[in-house]
From Swiss-Prot:
It catalyses: myo-inositol + NAD(+) = scyllo-inosose + NADH + H(+). Signal peptide: none annotated. Belongs to the Gfo/Idh/MocA family. Its EC number is 1.1.1.18. It comes from Mycolicibacterium vanbaalenii (strain DSM 7251 / JCM 13017 / BCRC 16820 / KCTC 9966 / NRRL B-24157 / PYR-1) (Mycobacterium vanbaalenii). The gene is iolG1. Involved in the oxidation of myo-inositol (MI) to 2-keto-myo-inositol (2KMI or 2-inosose). Pfam families: GFO_IDH_MocA, GFO_IDH_MocA_C. GO terms for molecular function: inositol 2-dehydrogenase (NAD+) activity; nucleotide binding. This is Inositol 2-dehydrogenase 1. InterPro entries: Gfo-Idh-MocA_inositol_DH, Gfo/Idh/MocA-like_OxRdtase_C, Gfo/Idh/MocA-like_OxRdtase_N, MI/DCI_dehydrogenase, NAD(P)-bd_dom_sf. Keywords: NAD, Oxidoreductase. Homotetramer. One of its GO terms (biological process) is inositol catabolic process.
Length: 343
């Protein structure tokens, strides 16, 4: 396949960014169709792109003959129906998180894809494509740091929308650290606890902020995550790995820094996720497009996190919301992957 036609469903902040990315920086793809629940927004955007059309119904957009692949940047509650439509039409899809909003529907999506015998769903956990996270993963896999022991994470936002509640801190923010943990350690998370320290007096009433998440992996590794979404400062995402033979920090806006390495650093903090992970998004979409284009030959239409990864993240976050409410550690409940051939 030479150039693929992509439908972008949902053209809010994330979707519009993907439209601009595909239209200007990604090779081998064009934006063929856009869709949004605000029809006028999609129509205005389509008018700025040669050969692009706005289609009001998302299922019609998926089925359209000019569409070879789909990017889902729609609200989470719509994902199940749209993902199943993509599977029905056998169209590769890159779905922004979450896969779906609950464990049962996420598992159903995993099963439906597995029944087809072809991998069509990729989930948009973009940190796996970030140069710093990839360098950290390579260090772990290379073994020079010895056995990884502990992961310390920081996830801060300057501000969040008015509808953002305490559970969304788990589902929308922590979900990235959940996937990072599984990506770096190649194992599942088996329990989660949410600790609520002294609250930020500047956060609106009813929003517990900050929160501290404590994760435990199947092999017993400890992961702690500071989640602080009303700092009023900037967008900050940092990760420190502590291993048997040293430690590594990423997210200092200067690239990977090893504790023993000489040098100094300084500069500004990235204002939002678009700047911090711009390279990761570009790499993610380009690799996905390349996989879709070669899928007819290879039989593989994805190059990144799978539907199973989306299901696992949903399962951990669902347990996390329970832990937020109870204040106690909660076991993560998942089916055994081997019980679903092809998952």
């Amino acid at each position: 396949m030479s150039e693929i036609g992509v439908a972008v469903l949902g053209v809010g902040l994330m979707g519009a960014d993907h439209v601009a990315r595909i239209a200007s920086r990604i090779s081998g793809a064009r934006v063929a169709v856009v869709n949004d629940q605000v029809t006028e927004k999609a129509e205005r955007l389509a008018a700025t792109i040669t050969g692009c059309r706005a289609i009001a119904d998302p299922l019609d957009a998926i089925a359209d003959r000019d569409v070879d692949a789909v990017v889902l940047a729609t609200p989470g509650p719509t994902h199940e129906k749209q993902l199943l439509a993509c599977l029905e039409h056998r169209k590769p899809v890159l779905c922004e998180k979450p896969l779906t909003t609950d464990v049962e529907t996420s598992l159903e999506v995993v099963r439906r894809e597995a029944e087809l015998g072809v991998r069509l769903i990729q989930v948009g956990f973009m940190r796996r494509f970030d140069d710093e996270y990839r360098a950290l993963k390579a260090l772990i896999d290379g073994g020079e740091l010895g056995n990884p022991l502990v992961l310390h994470c920081v996830h801060r936002n300057p501000v969040v929308p008015g509808h953002f509640d305490s559970a969304m801190t788990v589902r929308d923010s922590l979900v990235h650290e959940v996937d990072v943990t599984r990506f770096l350690f190649d194992e599942e998370i088996v329990s989660i606890q949410i600790v609520k320290p002294t609250p930020n007096s500047l956060a609106r009433e009813g929003l517990f902020d900050p929160q501290i998440a404590i994760l435990r992996t199947a092999s017993g590794r400890h992961v702690d995550v500071e989640l602080f979404v009303t700092t009023g400062v900037a967008y900050e995402v940092r990760t420190e790995l502590v291993a048997e033979k040293g430690s590594v920090i990423i997210g200092l806006d200067v690239g990977l820094v090893r504790k023993s390495a000489p040098g100094t650093w300084g500069g500004t903090i990235t204002p939002s996720f678009k700047e911090r992970f711009g390279q990761a998004y570009d790499t993610e979409i380009q690799r996905w497009v390349d996989a879709v284009r070669s899928g007819g030959t290879t039989g593989i239409y994805t190059d990144g996190p799978t539907a199973w990864d989306g299901y696992a993240a949903t399962a951990v976050c669902e347990a996390g919301v329970q832990a937020l409410q109870s204040g106690q550690p909660v076991a993560v409940s998942m089916v055994d992957r081997v019980s679903i051939p092809g998952a």
